[in-house]
Amino acid sequence: MSNVPAELKYSKEHEWLRKEAEGTYTVGITEHAQELLGDMVFVDLPEVGATVEAGADCAVAESVKAASDIYAPISGEIVAVNEELNDSPELVNSDPYTDGWIFKIKASDEAQVAALLDAAAYEALLEDE
């Protein structure tokens, strides 16, 4: 079973969300998602300053197996991207919940966070797949 940190929120599309300061959240893909994709070769990062809607594709993870869209779990403005992934996309595989984060988003509606899955609900989703 994949590692599912209890302090994070999750989307049904296998993104995770970690609360930072002042309405900002860090986003990445889950361990389960990176296991399905295999070794990352490139991550197409979103543009800082871009406004995204919850559920909209805003980045792409390319692996040896496939290219997969990464979706914004909440609406808001992209305030940072993980530039380390330009040279080391494998961080998404080796450390998906810390060094392999993909972008940071300033929430336009923090109520959307409550609609995301907690760790137990995400684990249940994985069991059903």
UniProtKB/Swiss-Prot annotation:
Similarity annotation? Belongs to the GcvH family.
Ranges where the Lipoyl-binding domain occurs: 24-106
Pfam families listed in its UniProt record: GCV_H (PF01597)
Q: Which GO terms describe its biological process?
A: glycine decarboxylation via glycine cleavage system
Question: Assembly state and interactors?
Answer: The glycine cleavage system is composed of four proteins: P, T, L and H.
Q: Which Gene3D superfamilies match?
A: 2.40.50.100
Q: What does this protein do?
A: The glycine cleavage system catalyzes the degradation of glycine. The H protein shuttles the methylamine group of glycine from the P protein to the T protein.
Report the domain of life of the source organism: Bacteria
Q: Which GO terms describe its cellular component?
A: cytosol; glycine cleavage complex
Q: Which classification does the entry list for the species? A: Bacteria, Pseudomonadati, Pseudomonadota, Gammaproteobacteria, Enterobacterales
> Under what name is this protein listed?
Glycine cleavage system H protein
Q: Does the keyword Cell membrane apply?
A: no
| Cofactor binding note from Swiss-Prot or TrEMBL | Binds 1 lipoyl cofactor covalently.
Provenance organism: Klebsiella pneumoniae subsp. pneumoniae (strain ATCC 700721 / MGH 78578)
